[in-house]
């Protein structure tokens, strides 16, 4: 099991114009408060504005013989150094000016998911997390992301 760290690094910033598809790494994006990532199909006034996935989990998946790129599982932010799936709901993450709050761990993969059809399986249902944007700003590859510990 991966060691839990309080901080990590953004490895990719990905968006897609439609839901249920792979995302494309755009390297930098504007996150809007209570909306999500500008230009992403999942943005909106709901609890799954931004999806996050641990980079290490994608690397483990690739070691099994897959060859997936950033955004292949529909994740918005690919994070190195934090085991996203182990973060409890309500955890806050800071990346520069951006403040996110974890709202959901995992998801149900809908039948006929384009990602599952292409890749063969999807790790988002058990490794991905979702968050809402409490404070907006710009996020880019290489930015530090850290868990905000409550006093």
Segments from the language model and where they lie:
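Metal-cofactor-dependent catalytic cores
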Residues: 1-151
């Amino acid at each position: 099991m991966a060691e839990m760290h309080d901080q990590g690094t953004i490895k990719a910033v990905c968006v897609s114009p439609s839901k249920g598809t792979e995302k494309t790494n755009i390297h930098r994006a504007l996150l809007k408060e209570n909306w999500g990532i500008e230009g992403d199909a999942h943005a909106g006034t709901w609890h799954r504005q931004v999806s996050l996935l641990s980079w290490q989990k994608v690397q483990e998946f690739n070691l099994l013989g897959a060859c997936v790129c950033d955004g292949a599982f529909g994740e918005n932010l690919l994070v190195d150094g934090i085991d996203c799936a182990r973060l409890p709901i309500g955890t806050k993450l800071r990346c520069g000016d951006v403040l996110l709050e974890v709202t959901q761990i995992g998801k149900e993969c809908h039948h006929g998911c384009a990602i599952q059809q292409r890749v063969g399986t999807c790790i988002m249902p058990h490794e991905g997390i979702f968050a809402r944007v409490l404070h907006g700003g710009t996020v880019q590859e290489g930015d530090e992301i850290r868990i905000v510990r409550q006093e």
